[in-house]
Amino acid sequence: MIILVVFALIGLVVGYLAISIKLSKAKEQAETILLKAEQDAVNLRSQAEHDADHLRVTAERESKAQRKELLLEAKEKARKYREDIEEEFKSERQELKQMENRLTERATSLDRKDENLSSKELALEKKEQSLADKSKHLNEREENVAQLEAEKQAELERIGQMTIAEAREVILTETENNLTHEIATRIKDAEAQIKDTVDKKAKNLLAQAMQRLSGDYVTEQTVTTVHLPDDNMKGRIIGREGRNIRTLESLTGIDVIIDDTPEVVVLSGFDPVRREIARMTLEALIKDGRIHPARIEELVEKSRKEMDNRIREYGEEAAYEIGAMNLHPDLIKIMGRLQFRTSYGQNVLRHSVEVGKLAGIMASELGENVALARRAGFLHDMGKAIDKEVEGSHVEIGTEFARKYKEHPVVVNAIASHHGDVEPESVIAVIVAAADALSSARPGARNESVENYVKRLRDLEEIASSFDGVQTSFALQAGREIRIMVHPNKISDDEVTILSHKIREQIEKNLDYPGNIKVTVIREFRAVDYAK
């Protein structure tokens, strides 16, 4: 009995060893088959790629008919390669499947026979899983090879069907895509270089214009002095109880200052026209020797007429200086009035001439119409001469008058756009705006404190003149007094007091000023008749 048991155990051990040897051989065969399959797949893919490259190069060099034949041959070879690979992979998969089944059956049998072999069975399962992974990997590689073959086939077909022009277009497109970034970078660098060049040229242009124009400028004053032959003349100018000096101040709106300064009378006022009329009147009175209210009225009226002639002469001289020919007489008179207008202390007529010259210089540098540029620059601020008489800004008024007197459209647009109210429609309009900024912004050209003082006095007079029945109004004593002359037929004696209170209220409401402002309303009634 013991012998039988021993023989049975020996038989089991021998059987187990035999099975182990067979399993080991089976594993080696499986690994060998897998390695061979992988190598064959790599070789086949390399051979297919090599043949495809060779066929493509050959197809490119030969004629169209030869390319078609080579493509057919390539297709046939690729098909055969694919069939051979599929057949080999199919056979190998079948063998692996059969081997896997046999190993599974044997492992199951051993598991039923001996529980001690469980650990080895687990190891075998792991190897089986590894084989499955490898099989999956082979399948994926097979799919990749098939995809590569399809892509190569499609590429060969596309290349074979291309003409020379199409092939050139493909190459150019690919090259353009590759160079897009480089092109964009170069364009950006070129734009920066152009901007830098334009800035330099603009600065050079302005520098040349400023160097070629050397103009004198003296800040406008708000006082005028009149020299007397002797100090005795001061008493005659004042008159009995001050009636002469009061008449002169009332008619001209200018402060006549007589102090201890020997042989000098000072005329103070922010309006240059009034101040000049007062100067002309006073000099005529001194020369004539007859100084009384009636003579003062007569000479003031005469001085106003002479002032109109002088204004026209100023306009003609400025137009001749700038070369603005065939100007309408009314425009000449308007420009002459600018001789007695200031902007931040800068004489507006001299500013207009300067802008015209600067615009002409810049136009010549840029190849534009020099005469038209000078004319536009000269007329750009003419609205300032009449902005107190017509509603609107000086730009709107100047544009309207330029159209009224049939000025060139370029001139009209330059006037309308020099402060940016409308878009410039020509290079000359831009030149005029630049020349205006250059003339007014240079150091010393303008004095803001003087302009603020003059503006305050003008606002004071405008408030007084806004009431119905007011004939004229004059700001005196540096704005510390406002003297209003009313129409005697519109304002009665009782209404004079009421009007003064209304004007005072408007001044307090709309103006900021230091100290007090004296409001004087004068109603003068005259009856004139002639004896025959």
Swiss-Prot record:
It is a single-pass membrane protein. It comes from the Bacteria. One of its GO terms (molecular function) is RNA endonuclease activity. It is found in: Cell membrane. GO terms for biological process: mRNA catabolic process. One of its GO terms (cellular component) is plasma membrane. Residues 222-282 form the KH domain. Keywords: Cell membrane, Endonuclease, Hydrolase, Membrane, Nuclease, RNA-binding, Transmembrane, Transmembrane helix. Residues 101-139 are annotated as: Disordered. Its main location: membrane. SMART domains: HDc (SM00471), KH (SM00322). It is an enzyme of class 3 (hydrolase). Residues 348-441 form the HD domain. The chain crosses the membrane at residues 1-21. Gene3D superfamilies: Hypothetical protein af1432, K Homology domain, type 1. Pfam families: HD, KH_1, RNase_Y_N. Its EC number is 3.1.-.-. Endoribonuclease that initiates mRNA decay. Belongs to the RNase Y family. This is Ribonuclease Y. It comes from Streptococcus thermophilus (strain ATCC BAA-491 / LMD-9).
